[in-house]
């Protein structure tokens, strides 16, 4: 499992460094802004992605948006959006997606770690 996760992480880093990543990230953020509903929102991105802050702030939304670098270790990329008024969050960070896929694999295979 660890080898698969390391390979997946390497593929994610490769994707982040590609020309397709910026478009993917902006579309995920736009989708998440809709999903969390109306209200003030904070968008957390990796410190490497903070260079996209101005583009993110231009995404059409009627709410107040704040963009911040996530302080999480291994955030990798992607975004986490929090509606600060409604306390609703959508997590499209690669860290979360990898964790979810690992859990799905462990559940479907019947393996247990510990």
Annotate each PLM feature.
Residues 1-114:
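Elongated, mostly alpha-helical coiled-coil "stalk/stator" tethers of large membrane protein machines
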């Amino acid at each position: 499992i660890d080898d698969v996760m390391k390979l997946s992480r390497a593929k994610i880093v490769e994707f982040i460094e590609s020309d397709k990543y910026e478009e993917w990230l902006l579309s995920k953020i736009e989708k998440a802004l809709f999903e969390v509903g109306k209200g003030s929102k904070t968008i957390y991105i990796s410190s490497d992605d903070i260079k996209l802050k101005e583009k993110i702030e231009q995404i059409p939304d009627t709410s107040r948006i704040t963009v911040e670098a996530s302080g999480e270790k291994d955030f990798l990329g992607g975004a986490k959006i929090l509606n600060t008024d409604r306390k609703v969050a959508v997590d499209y960070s690669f860290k979360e997606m990898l964790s979810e896929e690992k859990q799905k694999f462990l559940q479907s295979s019947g393996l247990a770690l510990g």
